Amino acid sequence: MSSTSASPISNITVDDELNLSREQDFAEEDFIVIKEERETSLSPMLTPPHTPTEEPLRRVHPAISEEAVATQLHMRHMAHYQQQQQQQQQQQQHRLWLQMQQQQQQHQAPQQYPVYPTASADPVAVHQQLMNHWIRNAAIYQQQQQQQQHPHHHHHHGHPHHPHPHPHHVRPYPAGLHSLHAAVMGRHFGAMPTLKLGGAGGASGVPSGATGSSRPKKQFICKYCNRQFTKSYNLLIHERTHTDERPYSCDICGKAFRRQDHLRDHRYIHSKDKPFKCSDCGKGFCQSRTLAVHKVTHLEEGPHKCPICQRSFNQRANLKSHLQSHSEQSTKEVVVTTSPATSHSVPNQALSSPQPENLAQHLPVLDLSSSSSSSEKPKRMLGFTIDEIMSR
């Protein structure tokens, strides 16, 4: 039953008022939502209510969400860092274990090769140790090669109390130790003399003039005088002096030469003018040095004099040949001519064989170092003389 009020203004009961108040509340909320939607929407038509998102929550509790995200990231970083630390520790423990295993193997394995010498070691003892080790390994290696070549001989005639060494136990001389051995011996035994195993005659097969690094030079021997040359062209030119072969001839004057460069020098005389002329005879020359040599021939007294007969020569080569004739004549006179007093006093002495002291007394003293004074001797000019040019 519903209770009614006695007010004459309206006939509204209490239940009706409660229902009206509820309807008004709902209507106000709906009005607010509709009003907000109308403000934000572009069309005048009604739209469904706005779906709530995370933005209102962040607006209400902004500090709590940032702290939660920061703590989660920090925990992840800490877990990753701890995992890396554990992996590094495990790797370090594995390395230490491997090093310990290698050290144990090195201590257990026997030493295969001799210890290389140091600066403080005795050089003589080190050298002896290396040589003994090399000789022993060489003998074992040679014995093994013989066994491989003749296996049946060792099978029938081998003694049981001399077992053959196993091939795995043979340690031949390492190839890399040769260079090390040479370097060490050069440092410790630099002053020691080398031993020649081939004897004085060089029986080892290596030429005496050839070194370990230098290549021996080729030798070309002349078949006429056995003179040696290092180049075949020089031997060919030399042999033409024996055969007097002159394959290069001048087209103008017909003069022949042994060498092509001599012909080229000769053609230079024909092809060019002769600006240098002699003032005495009027002869022209291509070069000034040739004219200077020619002027010596016009001197009344040559610059080179013989110390025995005072004969003068224009060229030093002519003086040398003249002095040789004096020496031959003096030796013949001393051998043939003897004094009569010497022959009667010493009858048993041979007349044709004088003593060396007497021979030295009779021979004239020849001074070839200074044939004339420095003032009279002209300065030696570079190049060829006229006689040398004409003798080609």
Swiss-Prot record:
The keyword NAD does not apply. It is found in: Nucleus. SUPFAM superfamilies: beta-beta-alpha zinc fingers (SSF57667). PROSITE patterns: ZINC_FINGER_C2H2_1, ZINC_FINGER_C2H2_2. Pfam families: zf-C2H2. Residues 336-356 have a biased composition (Polar residues). GO terms for biological process: blastoderm segmentation; embryonic hindgut morphogenesis; embryonic pattern specification; imaginal disc-derived leg joint morphogenesis; Malpighian tubule morphogenesis; negative regulation of DNA-templated transcription; negative regulation of transcription by RNA polymerase II; pattern specification process. A zinc finger (C2H2-type) spans 220-242, 248-270, 276-298, 304-326. Keywords: Activator, Developmental protein, DNA-binding, Metal-binding, Nucleus, Pair-rule protein, Repeat, Repressor, Transcription, Transcription regulation, Zinc, Zinc-finger. Residues 150-171 have a biased composition (Basic residues). It comes from the Eukaryota. Residues 142-174, 320-356 are annotated as: Disordered. The keyword Isomerase does not apply. GO terms for molecular function: DNA binding; DNA-binding transcription factor activity; DNA-binding transcription factor activity, RNA polymerase II-specific; RNA polymerase II transcription regulatory region sequence-specific DNA binding; zinc ion binding. Its main location: nucleus. Has two temporally distinct modes of expression during early embryogenesis; expressed in seven stripes at the blastoderm stage, then during gastrulation the seven primary stripes are supplemented by secondary stripes which appear in alternate segments. This results in the labelling of every segment in the extended germ band. Also expressed in the embryo in distinct regions of the gut, the Garland cells associated with the proventriculus, the pericardial cells, the lymph glands associated with the heart, in a subset of cells in the central nervous system and in select apodemes. GO terms for cellular component: nucleus. InterPro entries: C2H2-ZF_Transcription_Reg (IPR050717), Znf_C2H2_sf (IPR036236), Znf_C2H2_type (IPR013087). Pair-rule protein that determines both the size and polarity of even-numbered as well as odd-numbered parasegments during embryogenesis. DNA-binding transcription factor that acts primarily as a transcriptional repressor but can also function as a transcriptional activator, depending on the stage of development and spatial restrictions. May function redundantly with odd and drm in leg joint formation during the larval stages, acting downstream of Notch activation. Belongs to the Odd C2H2-type zinc-finger protein family. This is Protein odd-skipped. The lineage of its organism: Eukaryota, Metazoa, Ecdysozoa, Arthropoda, Hexapoda.
